[in-house]
């Protein structure tokens, strides 16, 4: 009988997981699972995410904290205890956090140590939404809830019957301050902690109000309570406030913060919370997500596909986060990490362009251009105040990763039609960054070699040299595209088109692969195409050879033509997932993720490889793109805590899924084109900000019918392997006829291939 009951339970559950959703949801925010990717650790990333509670691009995010203070893995799904509910600005565990503080309700003995206050919890009593978080803290018999605004939040703490109910405020170490004001039921303070870059006069000020007077309280510093001191400043400060509560009594906290001042934090609180109840704030946050997520409607897929889709779209809208605030005069202002002062205008932080130039920013330009206009204005302020465009902003320049990919982010926005900001200053900033070495991964390391030789040599003690050269060449292409679009003299932008061909100097004619090259012109010897790092960045030659976004046709010629090009693409999936990790001295997590994926040398868990699948469109075999796109979505994305196949990286890995599920991808930002794949859903609608709609239909789509038999664009037969951004922006209907067998006639003519600089007729 027990076996029968078990089967009865399993079968409906399995049916539910594969249930088809035929209608686009009215509440897509309810399909979001913020816990996707949280089952991660330094040695293996399944996303390296945390369950961010925020509004789209909010200045602050919130998360339950399971990791110790200072641990970049601030929430992991396999943890047993929660140490606090934390305000965070952390874009990645590898970047760590800045300006954080936490709040933790407790009962019983007055205490503050993070280990002593921690409580067991269960995922069965945890609710995680983009706009709301709730958890039952078993050791304290307290339920903690939180809902956010852009710069504020409300917490609702439900206590048991206790004479000793408390909450702990932890302002973290490396410089903090706290002040208890009992007469106003108020605690204020600041945190100065940060992890990356150089920050001037940095503080995150916070203010907390309770609706219940606290009758007992104490500040604390480092490891001890501080008697008779309502205000304390030091390395690691905090407070504990308490009161008696009845069973089920709810204590409400109203919280806000500012990077500018306590007065601005108070203003943020009054402006964003006003007199709203917890539930009113929750409903506003829910509506904010609903508005953004419903810009893209999908239907005709399984419930798991819907969950993965909207969870990915949510991740794309968390970062970069706003660093600007609105002052008492209604003016937009921001704390500048460069001057340490309050400056006018927009500013954003929490993104690395090495990751996000590929798909995240192109998707913003298509669906959410107005927020990217603000971001472009923010980049202008970065340049004016700091002297450089950031490549990794957290919240200032961060000395990590390679490339000069701000060029792509700026150029793609303008080429895709974004206007209303000072593009001339941004163009000036790109030229400056393209020709100079800057601090903390800005500008171009090795630029003098690059300008003289056309590449960064392998033997001049500049690491990741081949990868740098390939990325600089693409970035030069982006600058040329922008200069041309701005009507600059050809003598100016023409030079950058020439530099964009420097990729040719990195392709070894013997192996047909990218390879480090010495100062004297000889290629690196010995050479192992499976060796990670060294001449490349978090990858090997099989991954980086294809980073010629601007001229895939030119790359194919160097490989001996399109047939050889396709054969080399095939090898990526046919070769075993072998590797040489000697450069690192151990197996870094990106290597392990490639091995675990079991797709040969294809390393989707890291960004340099994510466009590779789409390159079959350039060699007349688009059906292989269609096959591998669906395989990747099926195998490497799930709506579960281990749902990603590597670092999610601030929306980029999610953006690949969103684009691919819609049927196209941005292989070459800074052009007008997207490269075709095949849609995942039977129906999709993209509601553009200009009021137009892109409708994507694939009535006979299924897991078996993953190949494109034919395509109609606005009712007319369409054979090209690419779509025009400018045409899509007019509104469009794409009708795919899907089949279980590849159509090896469609998209095979050279005239149907996507853009390559070598074949550009303009």
Segments predicted by a language model, with ranges:
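Bacterial Sec-dependent N-terminal signal peptides
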Residues: 1-22
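Accessory carbohydrate-recognition regions in carbohydrate-active enzymes
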Residues: 20-361, 365-408, 414-470, 478-505, ...
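ATP-dependent phospho-/nucleotidyl transfer catalytic cores
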Residues: 475
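Conserved catalytic core of nucleotide polymerization and phosphodiester-bond processing enzymes
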Residues: 698
């Amino acid at each position: 009988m027990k076996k029968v009951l078990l089967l009865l339970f399993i079968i409906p559950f399995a049916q539910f997981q594969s249930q088809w959703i035929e209608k686009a949801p009215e509440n897509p925010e309810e399909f979001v699972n913020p816990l996707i990717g949280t089952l991660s650790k330094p040695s293996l990333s399944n996303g390296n995410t945390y369950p961010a509670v925020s509004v789209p691009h909010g200045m602050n995010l919130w998360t339950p904290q399971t990791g110790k203070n200072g641990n970049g893995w601030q929430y992991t799904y396999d943890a047993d205890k929660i140490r606090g509910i934390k305000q965070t600005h952390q874009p990645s565990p590898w970047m760590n956090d800045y300006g954080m503080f936490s709040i933790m309700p407790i009962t019983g003995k007055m205490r503050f140590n993070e280990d002593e206050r921690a409580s067991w919890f269960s995922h069965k009593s945890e609710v995680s939404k983009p706009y709301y978080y709730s958890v039952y803290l078993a050791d304290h018999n307290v339920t903690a809830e939180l809902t956010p605004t852009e710069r504020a939040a409300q917490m609702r703490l439900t206590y048991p019957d206790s004479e000793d109910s408390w909450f702990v405020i932890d302002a973290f170490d490396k410089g903090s301050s706290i002040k208890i004001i009992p007469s106003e039921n108020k605690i204020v303070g600041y945190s100065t902690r940060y992890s990356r870059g150089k920050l001037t006069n940095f503080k995150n000020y916070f203010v907390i109000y309770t609706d219940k007077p606290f009758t007992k309280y104490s500040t604390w510093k480092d490891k001890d309570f501080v008697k008779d001191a309502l205000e304390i400043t030091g390395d690691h400060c905090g407070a504990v406030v308490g009161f008696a509560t009845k069973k089920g009594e709810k204590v409400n906290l109203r919280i806000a913060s500012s990077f500018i001042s306590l007065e601005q934090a108070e203003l943020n609180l009054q402006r964003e919370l006003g007199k709203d109840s917890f539930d009113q704030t929750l409903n506003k946050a829910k509506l904010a997500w609903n508005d953004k997520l419903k810009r893209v409607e999908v239907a005709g897929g399984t419930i798991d596909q819907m969950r993965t889709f909207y969870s990915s779209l949510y991740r794309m809208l968390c970062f970069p986060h706003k660093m600007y605030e609105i002052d008492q005069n209604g003016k937009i202002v921001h704390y500048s990490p460069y001057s340490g002062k309050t400056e006018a205008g927009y500013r954003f932080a929490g993104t690395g362009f090495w990751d996000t130039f590929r798909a995240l920013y192109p998707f913003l330009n298509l669906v959410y251009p107005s927020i990217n206009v603000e971001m472009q204005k923010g980049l202008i302020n970065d340049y004016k105040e700091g002297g450089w465009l950031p490549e990794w902003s957290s919240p200032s320049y961060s000395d990590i990763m390679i490339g000069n990919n701000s060029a792509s982010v700026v150029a793609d926005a303008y080429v895709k039609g974004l206007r209303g900001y000072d593009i001339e200053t941004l163009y000036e900033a790109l030229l400056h960054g393209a020709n100079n070495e800057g601090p903390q991964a800005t500008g171009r390391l090795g630029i003098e070699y690059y300008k003289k030789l056309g590449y960064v040599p392998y033997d001049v003690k500049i690491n990741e040299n081949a990868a740098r050269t390939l990325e600089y060449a693409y970035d030069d292409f982006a600058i040329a595209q922008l200069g041309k679009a701005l009507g600059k003299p050809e003598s100016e932008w023409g030079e950058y088109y020439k530099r964009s061909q420097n990729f040719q100097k990195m392709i070894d004619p013997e192996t047909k692969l990218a390879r480090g090259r010495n100062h004297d012109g000889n290629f690196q010897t010995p050479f192992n195409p499976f060796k990670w790092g060294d001449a490349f960045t978090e990858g090997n030659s099989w991954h980086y050879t294809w980073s010629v976004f601007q001229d895939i046709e030119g790359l194919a010629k160097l490989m001996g033509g399109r047939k050889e090009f396709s054969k080399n693409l095939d090898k990526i999936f046919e070769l075993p997932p072998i590797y040489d990790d000697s450069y690192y001295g151990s197996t870094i997590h990106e290597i392990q993720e490639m091995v675990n994926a079991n797709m040969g040398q294809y390393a989707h868990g890291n960004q340099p490889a994510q466009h590779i699948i789409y390159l079959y469109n350039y060699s007349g075999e688009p059906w292989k793109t269609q096959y591998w796109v669906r395989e990747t979505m099926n195998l490497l994305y799930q709506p579960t805590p281990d749902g990603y196949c590597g670092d999610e990286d601030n929306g980029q890995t999610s953006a690949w899924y969103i684009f691919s599920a819609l049927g196209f991808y941005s292989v070459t930002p800074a052009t007008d084109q997207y490269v075709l794949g095949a849609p995942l859903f039977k129906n999709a609608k993209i509601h553009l900000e200009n009021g137009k709609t892109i409708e994507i239909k694939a009535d006979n789509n299924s897991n078996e019918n993953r190949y494109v038999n034919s395509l109609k664009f606005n009712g007319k037969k369409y054979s090209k392997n690419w779509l025009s951004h400018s045409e899509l922006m007019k509104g469009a209907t794409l009708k795919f006829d899907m089949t279980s067998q590849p159509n090896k006639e469609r998209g095979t003519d050279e005239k149907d291939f996507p853009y390559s600089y070598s074949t550009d007729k303009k």
